[in-house]
A protein has these predicted regions:
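Conserved pre-motif I regulatory segment
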Residues: 2-38
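Conserved Helicase C-terminal RecA-like lobe
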Residues: 43-44, 48, 53, 57, ...
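Conserved Walker A/P-loop ATP-binding site and its immediately adjacent core
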Residues: 48, 61-83, 172-177, 377-380
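Conserved P-loop NTPase motor "coupling/switch" region that bridges the ATPase
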Residues: 62-64, 83-86, 107-108, 133, ...
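Conserved helix-turn-beta segment of the N-terminal RecA-like "Helicase ATP-binding" lobe
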Residues: 73-96, 189
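Conserved helix/coil segment N-terminal to the catalytic DExD/H
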Residues: 97-131, 144
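SF2 helicase motor core recognition
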Residues: 120-124, 173-175, 382-386, 408, ...
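A conserved SF2-helicase RecA2
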Residues: 448-455, 461-498
Length: 498
């Protein structure tokens, strides 16, 4: 087994310090070689992995490591590697000609940091480089066994002796997704998929998972190759968490329109149930080509209900975008129908926006050190919130569609500028980003996945937090689908913890 090397200031050596549980994790990563590192989000997966890789460098086990990570985290990885080591790191980014130069630099670098999309495009360059270790950060990117991305990463990882998958939630919603991740880590652990399927998954008439079984057996089979630490395991080293659920009532006009759209949604759901003999199967509904139109009817109404909860202006904006001939295939036909029928004419208030702005104002006024991270599903909503908070503070947007460099610039401004105290992010934008300089997090609306909710909250629940306690505030419209959504997420979270 390679010896641990935590000396200071020497080439290819880790220059930081680790908590005892991180040191234990490094030892197992070095001893076994193929490991699923399942430390809870915020517990230091990155620094733990860097320590392990540096020890491999020092013991001459490897001379180059490939780090595959979401695009939004590439520069965060670069900074962490430079912070804790003297190793050379190159980030593969930019247009084709610039990436070609990056790959040439990779020949003389210890770490290559790349997102899977760039890797897929640049395989001719990668094939000229020899890596002996691979790290996949946010390993849920491998959860699909059939995706091109997953197949490619597993293929290039196969000859590498050291394979590390990093995730805060090894099981998000589906054990079969864990199986796919384990195919990357060590395919011998869970064996052939047919056996795994029979042992752990109960399927319905259409072949879709109905429920899961023998989960303790699954857990036991992973003990040799998985390192798992929950928040409870390291609670004394994390900031205290204060949860707030803030109910917001509709105004009269908004409530009336919400009821109207809800009745319309219920009608289409009943039509779908009638089609399937009174037993509505969501999977069959979504996977039956003949049901595409009905699926669109249901989802369009759900989306407009969510827009109405967030800010009625989103419905109007979506309607106008749909009507714009310069923006084909954008906007919502149903939102346009609602707007053109005059149903939005009396809906002038946005109770949730007002409540959130008031909350942010109070938080920022309470202490000049307070900083706020806010998540919302709709990117357009983030822009509306930014406009509404202009007089309170400078803010940055961080969302899908921005380049990795733009995201990194936004993060650095929020981190280093005392006057930039609001970080506005979409779920796609904020995946895995470390924001220990913030002590308040607002879920303006809720995702459907408990894993995404954990991802949101873990942005500020971190070992590196600058505060003894952090506050997570969730805003929920009363009498709306958001109340049920919140309950479902709490149930999913309980199941995941179990």
């Amino acid at each position: 087994m390679p010896q641990l090397c935590y000396h200071l200031g020497l080439p290819n050596m880790f220059t930081g310090s680790l908590y005892p549980y991180q040191e234990e994790s490094v030892e197992k990563m070095l001893d076994r070689g193929q490991v699923l590192l399942g430390l809870v989000m915020g517990a230091g997966k990155t620094v733990t992995t860097i320590a392990a890789i540096e020890s491999l460098f020092e013991s001459n086990e490897i001379d180059r490591c490939l780090v595959v990570t979401p695009a939004s985290l590439k520069y965060q990885w670069k900074r962490e590697i430079e912070r804790f080591t003297n190793s050379r790191v190159v980030v593969i980014d930019g247009p084709a000609k610039l990436r070609e130069k990056c790959w040439k630099s990779a020949l003389s670098s210890s770490y290559i940091v790349v997102n899977p999309e760039c890797l897929m495009r640049d395989m001719p360059f990668f094939n000229k480089i020899n890596c002996q270790a691979i790290v996949v950060d946010e390993a849920t990117m491998l959860k699909s066994r059939v995706s091109k991305r997953s197949k490619l990463v597993k293929k290039i990882a196969k000859p590498m002796l050291y394979r590390y998958a990093l995730t805060g939630q090894p099981i998000e919603n589906k054990p079969e997704e864990l199986y796919s991740i384990m195919e990357f880590v060590d395919p011998t652990i869970l064996g052939p998929f047919a056996n795994f399927d029979r042992t752990f998954i109960v399927r319905d008439h259409w072949g879709k998972p109905l429920r899961y079984r023998n989960l303790m057996e699954l857990h036991n089979s992973l003990t040799s190759c998985m390192i798992r630490k929950t928040r409870e395991d390291i609670a004394d080293q994390l900031p205290e968490i204060i949860h707030q659920v803030i109910p917001v009532p509709f105004d009269e006009a908004g409530a009336s329109l919400y009821r109207t759209i809800s009745k319309d949604l219920l009608y289409h759901l009943q039509q779908a149930m009638s089609k399937h003999g009174g037993s509505f199967n969501l999977w069959k509904h979504y996977n039956d080509p003949a049901s595409n139109e009905a699926q669109g009817q249901i989802m369009s109404r759900l989306t407009v209900l969510r827009m109405l909860c967030d800010n009625p202006q989103l419905v109007i904006n979506s309607s106008e975008i749909y009507a714009d001939p310069k923006r084909p295939d954008e906007g919502s036909a149903y939102a346009h129908d609602i707007h053109s029928r005059g149903l939005m004419s009396k809906v002038n208030a946005s109770p949730k926006l007002d409540a959130v702005v008031e909350y942010i104002e109070e938080v920022l006024a309470a202490d000049p050190k307070n900083k706020v991270v806010l998540f919302s599903f709709f990117k357009e909503n983030l822009r509306l919130i930014q406009k509404a908070t202009t007089k309170l503070t400078n803010s940055v947007l961080f969302m899908g569609g921005m380049s990795a460099e733009e995201k990194d610039t936004a993060k650095q401004k929020f981190s280093n500028d005392a006057n930039t105290r609001l970080f506005l992010s979409s779920d796609a934008g904020g995946y895995g980003v470390d924001l220990p300089m913030a002590n308040y997090l607002i879920s303006y609306d809720l995702p459907w996945s408990s894993g995404k909710l954990e991802q949101r909250e873990a942005r500020i629940i971190r070992l590196s937090s600058q505060f003894p306690h952090v506050t997570i505030a969730t805003f929920v419209m009363q009498g709306s689908i958001e109340e049920r959504q919140y309950e479902m997420l709490q149930q999913k979270r309980s199941i995941n913890e179990a």
